[in-house]
């Protein structure tokens, strides 16, 4: 990994490498308001992107109009050339500090979707994310297949337990951004989110 960063730095590819993570981690982000009625849905979507012509934005495998009904999105205004850099952080493997260093060096903000284990075991890195102006989103407490959770109480528990850890750690409310684990979601998840 060290060699990768050295080579990338020499070739000026640090931001390009970080941008590639966005492509690899492309999943639905829900701007959750933690409210709404629940309706059962058996159809599970395994989130993914497909890429068309060079220079064109990727297309998701869920219709943007459908997602918009639930205040969910995977990309914003396509007329504006903006890249939203996001990371899923379920465990620490030594990469987060160098990523944060690179983001800071280039003054690039990012969003980190964290699970409970990360919040519990990496408090210094979480605080650093917040102090350096990054956004921390909710990736659930235990990273289950949320599309398999049918009752709203269990669904909320996964999100609220993570929110409580974040609040205890940072003294702030966790932003209402949710990314479903494994990229799996269904209509009832969108309604509960």
Name every feature range the model reports, one short phrase each.
Residues 2-86, 91-105:
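N-terminal pre-catalytic segment of deacetylase/amide-hydrolase enzymes
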Residues 98, 120, 143-193:
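Catalytic domains of cell-wall/extracellular-matrix polysaccharide-remodeling enzymes
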Residues 90-93, 116-119, 183-185:
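Short beta->alpha connector loops
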Residues 85-86, 90, 114-115, 143-153:
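Second-shell loop/turn segments in exported
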Residues 83-86, 110-114, 135-140, 176-180:
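Structural recognition of the beta-strand scaffold that forms the well-ordered cores
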Residues 99-106, 119-139, 193:
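Acidic (Asp/Glu)-rich catalytic clusters
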């Amino acid at each position: 990994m060290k060699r990768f960063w050295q080579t990338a730095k020499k070739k000026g590819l640090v931001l390009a490498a970080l941008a590639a993570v966005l492509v690899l981690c492309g999943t639905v982000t829900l701007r959750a308001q933690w409210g709404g009625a629940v309706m059962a849905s058996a159809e599970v979507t395994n989130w993914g992107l497909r890429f068309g012509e060079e220079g064109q934005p990727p297309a998701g495998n869920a219709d943007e109009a459908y997602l918009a009904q639930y205040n969910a999105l995977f990309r914003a205004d396509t007329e504006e050339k903006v890249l939203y850099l996001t990371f899923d952080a379920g465990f620490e493997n030594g990469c987060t500090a160098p990523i944060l260093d690179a983001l800071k060096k280039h003054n690039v903000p990012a969003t980190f979707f964290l699970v409970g284990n990360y919040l519990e075991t990496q408090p210094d890195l979480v605080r650093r994310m917040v102090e350096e102006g990054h956004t921390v989103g909710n990736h659930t407490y235990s990273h289950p297949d949320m599309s398999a959770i049918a009752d709203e109480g269990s669904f909320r528990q996964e999100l609220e337990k993570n929110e409580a850890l974040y609040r205890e750690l940072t003294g702030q409310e966790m932003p209402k951004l949710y990314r479903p684990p494994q990229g799996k979601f269904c209509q009832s998840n969108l309604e509960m989110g």
